[in-house]
Amino acid sequence: MTESYSLPDLVEAAAEVRKQAYAKFSNYKVGAALLAGDGTIFSGCNVENSSFGLTICAERSAVTAAVAAGRQTFQALALVTEKQGAPCGACRQVLAEFCGDEFPIHVAAAEDLGDIKTSTLGELLPDAFRF
């Protein structure tokens, strides 16, 4: 299902949840806002852990919140990071489980929410593993 959505609202939701990020070790805070097929926005932030491998990225936090609420189709993702950092490989693969290659990923800089870089999942993860 594809509906129109307000990109500024999606970015603002990501900026708001970024404030809740627990980035004690890296100080690199990320907020994610995932737009479900029904128009609901699910937010997530990164949560670091002293055992670094247990850190949860903002994107996966948003996806798991959405799935836990019964949503499995998504329209778009907005991220707010310090310097428009792209999703890590693990997050790209998790998104590929639910989203096609044309799924839009919008990344805004925390200092300027109007500075948005848009890519598709397929551009960021060509030849994604799909079982």
Regions found by a protein language model. Give the residues of each.
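C-terminal binding/interaction regions
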Residues: T2-A23, R71-F131
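Compact, glycine-rich, soluble single-domain proteins
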Residues: N46-R60
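Short beta-strand scaffold segments in enzyme catalytic cores
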Residues: N27-A36
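Alpha-helix C-terminal capping segments
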Residues: L35, T64-R71
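Short, well-ordered amphipathic alpha-helical segments that serve as non-catalytic structural scaffolds
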Residues: A13-E16, A58-A66
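Short acidic-glycine loop/turn motifs at beta-strand connectors
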Residues: A36-D38, E111-D112
